[in-house]
Amino acid sequence: MHTSIFAPLFAFCLTCSAADAAETKSTGDTFPHVIETFEVGENVNVRALTVETGKNTLWVGTSVGVHEIDIATRKVINTFTRDSGLANEYVFAVGVDKNGYKWFGTNAGGASRYRDGKWKTYFPMHGLADYWVYSFANQRNGDMWIGTWAGVNRVDLRSMKFTTYVKELINEWVYGIAVDKQDRVWFGTEGGVSMFDGKTWRSWSHKEGLGATNQGKLAASPNTGLGTRSRHDLSMLSGDGKLTYNPSYVFALQITPDQSVWAATWGGGVSRFDGTRWQNYTTREGLAGDIVYSIAQESNGVLWFGTNNGISRYDGKSWHNYDKKAGLLEDNVYALAVAPNGDIWAGSRRGVTRIGR
């Protein structure tokens, strides 16, 4: 049974639970299940999900603009497009800084900043490393980091000074950023992972164990579609139509309470770094798909992974997977976020799925 309620540019579709259809290697307690879906359009992609905890709202970055959703009521609060002040409607990243400004990373439009109805967009002329912006992260000292296709920016939010780092990184194409308890900053790039502790840099790639070996016999690809400025479709296919593989290509990072670093790789599954070595998890261990786009973490440490074949929930011991049969809008899940009430929000083509108990 499906019930649809339409709002401007954002349709709400209530979906029946289908948890029993999920593939699982777990037993025991009842798992979270798909509760409802929000559709944004047949050919629209949801690429970014960010929870603003102070307001209990969810920011949804899509290929046609940004929506602000009230988490409690699931109602649309705001919809922003180019006419509203957004630099470009194709949004790959959403961040919230210490001053409550919302930052939107766009495809070829720079970074737009918003608060209280006022907009400002930053371009390379202002110090931004590139027009293509893929990630934001905040340090405890208040600085914001911005990942682009031409390095990273460290932004002093008091002076709005932009400092750019390129050569220090293992690769200049930066997709994911995470900050650990020591305020060290980790960067996921198309060539591996780099870490900056404030003074020195370190880097790791597949040579050091990042990403599993090519178990699926996928086509080798140093460039999967995101690493070329002529295509922005998150293509998983090589020229001959085969799934591609690049274990050093890291699209997202997550730091867990034990300070392990989890890296989402392109074809090499998900990798966990304990400070000494990398341990890889693939479909052989229970991961839904070996191309991993996104990672989110619950307050209890449970991890969620968005892949090319659905979502995986991992509690440190066992896996539980979700796909279209379980109620997801699509199997390719590009973005994940955890709401204050523990619900999981998943972004894909066509819209967003909410998972909860």
Predicted feature residues:
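Bacterial N-terminal signal peptides that target proteins for export
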Residues: 1-7
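Carboxylate-rich, polar loop motifs that coordinate divalent cations or form catalytic acidic clusters
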Residues: 19-357
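Intrinsically disordered, low-complexity segments
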Residues: 2, 15, 245-246
